[in-house]
Amino acid sequence: MLTLALPKGRLAEETALLLLSKGWLKNLPSEGSKELTYVSEDKRIRLLFVRSQDVCTYVEEAAADVGIVGWDIIREGGFDLIAPVDLKLGACRLSLASFPDFDLFAKRSKVRVATKYPNLTREYFFSKGISCEIIKLYGSIELAPIVGLSDCIVDLVSTGGTLKANGLKEFESILFSTARLVSNRSSFYHKHAELRSLIESLEN
């Protein structure tokens, strides 16, 4: 039996529907259920529902054989995982945003940046040769420049609607992200036949 870690929320629902269409599930988990695990009727697969930020940890530490998680989280965490399949789900981009009159190169002191992605943000500003001060937040990132906490933000953008609603402009995309199937190295070799079957199902 393969154990698959899924992020709670919309991506878990999309993945469950995908697994249903590929024959890995015969029924969907009960809507609104508080259970954190779900085993398929044929015992081929067990689902774990965890926070998106924890999927890679569950997989890397072999608590799950595989997981589905955004490319942004994989890159930010620097996890030692195999990522064999791009599922093309949950497409979004990690972008630099601020007020329309913001000039990244005008400030002579450090640029103050609010983000949930300190490592990718630091890497981006380093590539530009610009010194930055990272302010790590866990939500409502768009609020930071509005209240003067930061000069700009680096955050995930899907449609840009939240930015526009708060008077902010997207300046540059740093990273394009979609959901990926990831595997820990041990499971990839020791459960290769099962994993290959899952991978082929998801790729077709």
From Swiss-Prot:
One of its GO terms (biological process) is L-histidine biosynthetic process. It catalyses: 1-(5-phospho-beta-D-ribosyl)-ATP + diphosphate = 5-phospho-alpha-D-ribose 1-diphosphate + ATP. The keyword Transport does not apply. It is found in: Cytoplasm. Disulfide bonds: none annotated. It is an enzyme of class 2 (transferase). Keywords: Amino-acid biosynthesis, ATP-binding, Cytoplasm, Glycosyltransferase, Histidine biosynthesis, Nucleotide-binding, Transferase. InterPro entries: ATP_PRibTrfase_cat, ATP_PRibTrfase_CS, ATP_PRibTrfase_HisG, ATP_PRibTrfase_HisG_short. Its EC number is 2.4.2.17. Pfam families: HisG. GO terms for cellular component: cytoplasm. One of its GO terms (molecular function) is ATP phosphoribosyltransferase activity. Its main location: cytoplasm. Lacks the C-terminal regulatory region which is replaced by HisZ. Belongs to the ATP phosphoribosyltransferase family. Short subfamily. Heteromultimer composed of HisG and HisZ subunits. PANTHER family: ATP PHOSPHORIBOSYLTRANSFERASE, ATP PHOSPHORIBOSYLTRANSFERASE ATP-PRTASE. NCBIfam families: hisG. This is ATP phosphoribosyltransferase. It comes from Leptospira biflexa serovar Patoc (strain Patoc 1 / ATCC 23582 / Paris). The lineage of its organism: Bacteria, Pseudomonadati, Spirochaetota, Spirochaetia, Leptospirales.
